[in-house]
Amino acid sequence: MRSYRCWRKVQETIRLYSSSSSSASSLLEFVNADFPSTIGIRGRREFARLLQLRASDDLLHYQNVVHGQIIVWGLELDTYLSNILINLYSRAGGMVYARKVFEKMPERNLVSWSTMVSACNHHGIYEESLVVFLEFWRTRKDSPNEYILSSFIQACSGLDGRGRWMVFQLQSFLVKSGFDRDVYVGTLLIDFYLKDGNIDYARLVFDALPEKSTVTWTTMISGCVKMGRSYVSLQLFYQLMEDNVVPDGYILSTVLSACSILPFLEGGKQIHAHILRYGLEMDASLMNVLIDSYVKCGRVIAAHKLFNGMPNKNIISWTTLLSGYKQNALHKEAMELFTSMSKFGLKPDMYACSSILTSCASLHALGFGTQVHAYTIKANLGNDSYVTNSLIDMYAKCDCLTDARKVFDIFAAADVVLFNAMIEGYSRLGTQWELHEALNIFRDMRFRLIRPSLLTFVSLLRASASLTSLGLSKQIHGLMFKYGLNLDIFAGSALIDVYSNCYCLKDSRLVFDEMKVKDLVIWNSMFAGYVQQSENEEALNLFLELQLSRERPDEFTFANMVTAAGNLASVQLGQEFHCQLLKRGLECNPYITNALLDMYAKCGSPEDAHKAFDSAASRDVVCWNSVISSYANHGEGKKALQMLEKMMSEGIEPNYITFVGVLSACSHAGLVEDGLKQFELMLRFGIEPETEHYVCMVSLLGRAGRLNKARELIEKMPTKPAAIVWRSLLSGCAKAGNVELAEHAAEMAILSDPKDSGSFTMLSNIYASKGMWTEAKKVRERMKVEGVVKEPGRSWIGINKEVHIFLSKDKSHCKANQIYEVLDDLLVQIRGVS
């Protein structure tokens, strides 16, 4: 009778518990069909099934009501129902109740332990999950099955590396018991090892599985892609196909991602064929990944055709193609596609707006960018960090820093990306005010306790390089260490550049040597620093180190090396580099052509320079300037003028550097009238004369003896004359022997550059040439008092591809004693011959 009364109450509960009349009636039919037989095991199981049917859409309150009824009926000690209650409470978010049910169970079977461990995992309580499992392991009456072992592995995986040793210890048990060959356990082990970054262990488990499910293949392939082993993921995919496993959309999508990363166009085409073969072309998400693969492999036309053929395009499809246009620098096409989105009634999301704003920035399309900005405000996308960052970048690149700052001030939160965008915008323009504003933004960033990233410091280093502030650069470098940031390629290159610009090549080399990973960008930065600071020998020695490394020199490397050879006037070295360029097929690069022209000109070989010019694949204004300067340096003014005429006849407009070469050619050749004409021609082209042009004109007039006219030209300069302009006049005075004007020119040069020894030396030599020894002595004494040191003359010689430098009275060479002995012997022989 007790059982009968209990099941009458169960029947009433079922009627209340079921909201759908059809489901309730069907349940009642089952219970009424053969009531006495349902009182036993069958009845309990059916009641459990009823609870599960309603678990998906029931509230926690109803779980408590049913639980209460179970207690009233005296069924709370039933292990089967308790297991179901734990599961139901877990799904409803009532882990407190699930835990109480579990703790009050007098007997727990394997399902009880598995359910509780799984419930803890479901709610992310991985530590408690491990505690429950370890309690089961300590008091186990039943042998573990694949479900509880899998739940344990999931818990260890959720601990982010802290459960590594537990899995290692469990591994031996799995091997002994044979569970390591279970596809379910094995798949979770593979997932754990991949998340732990241990791809080798994951591969061992994967290869040992006798049978692999689609989930197993998916886990292994996607894990390889996430860990940057895209090539391995492709190999696994081909192995999957050989095993006649039919890949699902997720596997194909993952492999396509690998093809995009590599990039591997042929692989993408093969996956495309599989998509068509298995009839998955209607899967929009898969087709979106295929479009992304094509655009990342540079096949934008194929991606566009695929896009046009999609019957069910969604916003992601449009955004993917839009991003592809941006990545391939097809910014006009991106703008047209963005416009088409509105015609089709689509509302661009934050990613589409971010992509199109980047295209606007690249094209300096301020008007279109402003319209997109208006749309983001209307669509309430302005608070998104991607959009805000792109807006700041767009306005900054369009030279509208005021608008960029407005966006920053309105939306800036504790987001390092936005601060980086604003600092980058100010640093890019390079004027004093903008550079100081970049530093102010950084100070505000630190005041708000926002942790800077490496990109922050790269932008700041660009600002300090423009300011040529060594102290600021060292402070920034120190802060990078303080924040514990490791130098990457960009930060290392920026540090090398800034120290080189501040004439601190030792610090540049320290940064270079400390870089654990050096790519060619780092090497080229160091080469450029040495060449810019005339440390050409160091550049050549470093090139020998590069040849011993894994990196291979590119056109920028050889451009620096050819320039270094030219600065050393070593035609032999220059020709060796030229031969290497021919072997590598780099001689057609415009950077290389210009460097070769300059090198041959400095080495006194204008004929070879002209040959390099004639063999150039394309001649830009820099190339023409180089050959004109080559003729100028060798006093062939007429040829330089002829090249200028030929240049203009080919439709290439000269720039201010062109006229520096032309005026220099006229000066060296004594072509005064031609020089004056070219100076006027420069003004017709709208080129304002700069210091270099005035130096050439003063030199031209000074060599012709027109010193007063040269002085008048200097006094008419719109800006304060630099020291080099006065030194040019001083040189003319030395040739003409005009002491009075020389004194004036020297004083003006010294006022402009007090530490330059050239002006003192030239004035002293003028006095000496006139026999004014007292005045010459006073100049030398003044140099000592003012701490002006004349840079000693140097000479160099290349022996066995090694450059040896010698200074006046220098004994630092390792074989100095032998060298001076030979020199003394030569002097004795010379005197004997004379």
UniProtKB/Swiss-Prot annotation:
Residues 725-800 are annotated as: Type E motif. Residues 801-831 are annotated as: Type E(+) motif. Gene3D superfamilies: Tetratricopeptide repeat domain. It comes from the Eukaryota. Pfam families: E_motif, Eplus_motif, PPR, PPR_2, PPR_3. PPR repeats lie at residues 78-112, 113-144, 145-181, 182-212, 213-247, 248-282, 283-313, 314-348, 349-383, 384-414, 415-452, 453-487, 488-518, 519-553, 554-588, 589-619, 620-654, 655-689, 690-720. InterPro entries: E_motif, Eplus_motif, Pentatricopeptide_rpt, PPR_At4g14850-like_plant, TPR-like_helical_dom_sf. One of its GO terms (biological process) is RNA modification. Keywords: Repeat. Belongs to the PPR family. PCMP-E subfamily. This is Pentatricopeptide repeat-containing protein At4g39530. It comes from Arabidopsis thaliana (Mouse-ear cress).
